[in-house]
Amino acid sequence: MKNNKGFTLIELLVVVAIIGILAAVGVVAYNGYTASAKANASKTMHSQAVKYISAEIQKCSLGESKFMGTNQDCPATAAKAVSGAVNTMTDKNPYDTSNNAVKSSSSFVAGQVSVSSSGSTVTVKTCTKSGCGSSDQLTASISVD
């Protein structure tokens, strides 16, 4: 009698199939996790930008002479506040880390915080997901007095 040791071909195929199924489930779960993490990072950056710009403008209205941690004088215009915010906020875009998240533009790219001005108002808009549908946009307006 032979004493066979080892696995049969069927046993090996079953193990490979099980590993394949587990890998497929893991990849799908991981992709969902990263998508929600990028959206949450975009929302957080939007909130931080609004708070930062508001706080700096408020400091200026209380008599502070310097603006956004630089030697710039406090802004008399919303445009100068936008320029200061874009130059000092260097967070990376979670959807494209080769670009900064905060930009002075009206274009809407996923993960980008667009800071613009009109008259005495600074507007902060953020697209939180790819596609930028109306439910994926955050907007805040800050008045510069």
What does each model-identified segment do?
Residues 35-65:
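Membrane-proximal N-terminal amphipathic helix
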Residues 1-47:
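Amphipathic alpha-helical segments typified by the pilin-like N-terminal helix
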Residues 30-33, 52, 95:
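Sequence-level detector for tyrosine residue identity
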Residues 10, 18-21, 53, 57, ...:
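Weak global preference for isoleucine
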Residues 55-145:
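Periplasmic/extracellular, small/polar-rich flexible segments of pilin-like filament-forming proteins
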